[in-house]
Amino acid sequence: MIPNTNYSELKDSYLFYHIAQKTKAYLNSHPDSYLYRMGIGDVSLPLCDAVVEALHRAVDDQSQKSTFHGYMPECGDPGLRETIADYYKKRKVSLLPEEVFVSSGASDELGDILDLFGRDKTVMIMEPAYPAYVDANIIAGNRIIHIPSGKENGFLPLPDETTAADVIYICSPNNPTGAVFNCEQLKLWVDYANRIDAVLLFDAAYEAFIEEEDIPHSIFEIEGAKTCAIEICSLSKTAGFTGTRLGYTVIPKELNR
């Protein structure tokens, strides 16, 4: 066997597992305490009725010869892809259903998408960041440029013309800070990516939490983004069913890398 030695560069344990272990230990020794859980972004309410009813119908369909099916289409259910494309119309973003790819969730896709770029790439990650970004790129053997953020830039770093990368991760609203890029700030990143032939991986998992009308939910609300960006979203957050594993990725036909 030829091992992937990049695994040895990972931290000893996954961040959320480490937090869960510390939480369990604390509650065992302080049984009367209540902890506000600020770790993994899990839900606190049961699935809504519409989701539960749809799951039941789907299971029942598998028990009848007339409605049973095996594998779904490779890129996802056509009706779901069309519905997702229609969802973007609310933000005046025009997508074709064939530009939408249904996945088993954003966490998996944020790592799997790297297979499109080959190996030995330079990747830019804004810190603090969702742990999956770093772990996936360590495993892939990519070079990582960590872009710091803090009070001085509102946790929203902007492009540095002296630095270049092949792939740039942007999460807005950010996990874990909650900071959100406005249109002008995202336009700077889009123009920068187009200038240096980079691809923006836009993590829109928390887009449904945006309340301000003038804040973009999608990178594709920004002019020029379709030639440089891929967007990944999670129904765990949008529809509130973590653990059900459903998300999607948008890759525009205009992407020219």
List each model region and its residues.
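N-terminal small-domain helix-loop-helix segment of the aminotransferase-like
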Residues: 2-104, 112
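Residue-level marker for buried hydrophobic side chains located in beta-strands
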Residues: 172, 200-201
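Helix C-cap/helix->beta junction micro-motif
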Residues: 30, 140, 195-196
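Hydrophobic/aromatic beta-strand patches that form the interior of the parallel beta-sheet core
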Residues: 36-38, 124, 145, 201, ...
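Conserved core of the PLP fold type I
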Residues: 66-191, 207-222, 226, 230
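Active-site PLP attachment segment
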Residues: 215, 221-257
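Walker B catalytic acidic pair
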Residues: 204
